[in-house]
Amino acid sequence: MNRRERLTRCYSHEELDRPAVYSRTGFPGNDPSYDKLKAYLQEHTELKAGWSGFRETPYPTESYREPYSEDFERHVTILHTPKGDLQCSMMASLKGQPGMAETYFIKTREDAEKYLSLPLPKIHGDASSFFVSVEQIGDDGIVDVSLGMNPAGTVATLLGTDAFAIMSVMDRDVIHDLCQREMNIIMRRLKFILDNKIGPFFSMAGEEYIVPPIHGPIDFHDFNVRYDKPIIDLIHDSGGYIHIHCHGSIKKVFHEFINMGVNVLHPFEAPSMGDITPHEAKELAKGKICLEGNIQINRMYDATPEEIKEETELLIQTVFDDHKGLIVCPTASPYIRGEGEECFPQYKAMIDTVLEWNRRMK
């Protein structure tokens, strides 16, 4: 079974010769300390090449920068809408670290109405690059078509956590209007993609913005399920598969991922980062969802190779008892600048444990 076939069988929930093993690849930019790890992943793990070759007509914006501190500068963006301007700002690192949102486009109901006055963007793009990616990855993996953030996740990034939570109580109708708008945009993206015979592997993220403890199961259903399911249904109707990335406490809403028809769910986090153990996740997912995880990313920097080997073996024993539905994977990309050599032995231990499990079973 080659790597492409193995991942395909994970997504379609068929029996496997061994678990797949994979890592997200959002490495720190221009960091040669990770070159050795990149080469090992390329040679030994199931690969996913990302594709998002569609384009949308941009909205009129202005931006400027201003000094803030030795570590950050402030980036300000002004968005022009038919009903007036909106403004957001973020802190951009001057030292190669992640940025931080400071203020958001939507702060009030009036801001939301301004945003809703924007026309829906037109979708275009060059589909040929997708087929080039498929040819390039060959039997080593799959090409993942990213649909971006889901509707509610996009809205959450427009408002920020606090304003979203407050408006979900005080102006719930506006949240629904915003989610409906974003769903319509994603449906347009998806129809463009499907019309160009692109697929069958798709992904979305953003559901994690509407999970406990900030939001309860009712909000998860109203804002995630309600607007994700039509998208997922269209994917399934085309013969495709959907991968969802959702951190956090998901045990109380796990059944909703099943109801939506999610094919692969990443990650599934035990306390303290989440609230669901591998055993609990497998009991709920068995026969329905492929689980992708779940080695906490900090363990790749803090643990020993022997500890990672033990964690990986226990994960396989717990989740792969039916020989289906497991992609062994850390919870996030390698992310600490300059620490590639430090985490390499732990990644190698995870990967080698999966590969050796297959050899032991023969």
Regions found by a protein language model. Name each.
Residues 26-70:
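Segments that shape or occlude catalytic/ligand-binding pockets
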Residues 28-31, 52-55, 86, 101, ...:
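Compositionally biased, intrinsically disordered low-complexity regions
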Residues 66-119, 140:
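A contiguous, low-structure linker/loop signature
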Residues 26-27, 37, 93-94, 104-107, ...:
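Short, charged/polar low-complexity linear motifs in solvent-exposed/disordered segments
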Residues 1-28, 80, 112, 116-362:
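Active-site loop segments of alpha/beta catalytic cores
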Residues 34-43, 87-98, 342, 349:
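Surface-exposed flexible segments
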